[in-house]
């Protein structure tokens, strides 16, 4: 049964998750309110573009593209940012645009740069938090570690909420429509892709597609799920009629089809070369230093995340029939 191998794999995966997310540096003074900028990429769709370099003291972990959609009666927030303070800055940006109530916060997936600002919004009992039907389990499994890491980086004298309540999440399984007032948005849950619990948001009025981390722009894609099924999701995204888009990381001014073609090429390299490594009895420790390195100059933050992607692919594909 290769139990020793299974245990080693689980330990290595846990270590890699720790190394990935412990790099996030947080601080209370990420932005002054007036400097927290949002841009209107389509009528009623406002985006804060996160810092594009890797996590650093300078950008304080504010690296995700997050934002909000304004209807005639209320506002929907898409992702809450990397900390309570970043979430509060996003909330302040909303108030500079409109006084309409916030009726929905949609968390595209559990990763801390999208999740940990949630408590900036949940004090308002009139709003609803939405996420994938598998999101509550992921919050219960991961959020304590994320929050403890956040507190460590904030340092003494800063107070944070120590829990994110998974029971607040209204689960989405399939398609869910929300009317913000003469503006209907659709939340869609996906299968295994960037994670096993991604959702996207589409503003039907403007054709604006909020991809979360299903799609990256110039930033190396990050795999926390199944490489084969991720590519299938991207193929489906290529067939959507999208007028405007928001990706989870990176610039928003490149052609949509180019982004997907580049990302599918990278995942295809992972799939082909990891399978070949397994067939030739190349160890995981050797594979992470050989598979896919011809892609290095094509992606930002390659050195930070590529080995992790190889590891995730290897530990999945070694069990395929």
Q: PLM ranges: what are they?
A:
Residues 12-23:
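Bacterial N-terminal signal peptides
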Residues 28-29, 33-40, 137-190, 204-205, ...:
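Metallo-beta-lactamase
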Residues 42-96, 199-211:
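Conserved beta-strand hairpin/beta-sheet module of binuclear metal-dependent hydrolase folds
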Residues 78-80, 103-111, 130-133, 190, ...:
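Active-site neighborhood of phospho(di)ester-bond hydrolases with catalytic His/Asp-centered motifs
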Residues 87, 92-170, 272:
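Active-site HxH/HxHxD metal-binding segment of metal-dependent hydrolases
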Residues 184-240:
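Active-site-proximal loop/helix segments of hydrolase catalytic cores
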Residues 231-282:
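Divalent-metal (often Zn2+) His-rich catalytic cores of metallo-beta-lactamase-fold enzymes
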Residues 279-321:
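C-terminal regulatory/interaction regions
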């Amino acid at each position: 049964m290769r139990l020793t191998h299974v245990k080693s794999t689980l330990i290595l995966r846990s270590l890699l998750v720790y190394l990935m997310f412990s790099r996030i540096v947080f601080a209370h003074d990420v932005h002054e309110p007036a400097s927290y900028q949002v841009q209107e990429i389509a009528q009623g769709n406002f985006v804060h573009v996160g810092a594009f370099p890797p996590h650093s003291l300078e950008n304080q972990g504010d690296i995700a593209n997050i934002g909000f959609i304004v209807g005639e009666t209320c506002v929907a927030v898409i992702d809450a940012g990397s900390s309570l303070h970043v979430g509060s800055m996003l909330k302040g940006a909303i108030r500079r645009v409109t006084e309409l109530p916030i009726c929905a916060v949609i968390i595209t997936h559990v990763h801390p740069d999208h999740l940990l600002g949630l408590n900036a919004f949940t004090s308002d009992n009139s709003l609803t938090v939405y996420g994938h039907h598998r999101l509550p389990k992921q919050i219960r499994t991961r959020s304590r570690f994320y929050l403890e890491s956040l507190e460590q980086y904030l340092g003494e004298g800063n107070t944070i909420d120590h829990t994110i309540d998974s029971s607040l999440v209204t689960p989405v399984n399939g398609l869910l429509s929300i009317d913000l007032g003469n503006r209907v948005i659709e939340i869609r849950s996906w299968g295994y892709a960037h994670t096993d619990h991604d959702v996207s948001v589409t503003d039907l009025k403007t054709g604006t597609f909020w991809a979360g981390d299903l799609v990256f722009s110039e930033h190396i894609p990050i795999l926390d799920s199944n490489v084969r099924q991720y590519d299938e999701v991207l193929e489906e995204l290529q067939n959507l009629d999208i007028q405007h888009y928001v990706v989870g990381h990176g610039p928003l001014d490149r052609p949509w089809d180019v982004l997907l073609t580049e990302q599918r090429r990278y995942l295809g390299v992972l799939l082909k070369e990891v399978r070949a490594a397994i067939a030739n009895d190349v160890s995981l420790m050797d594979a992470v230093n050989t598979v896919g390195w011809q892609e290095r100059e094509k992606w930002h933050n390659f050195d930070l995340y590529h080995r992790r992607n190889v590891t995730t692919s290897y530990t999945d594909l070694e069990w395929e029939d």
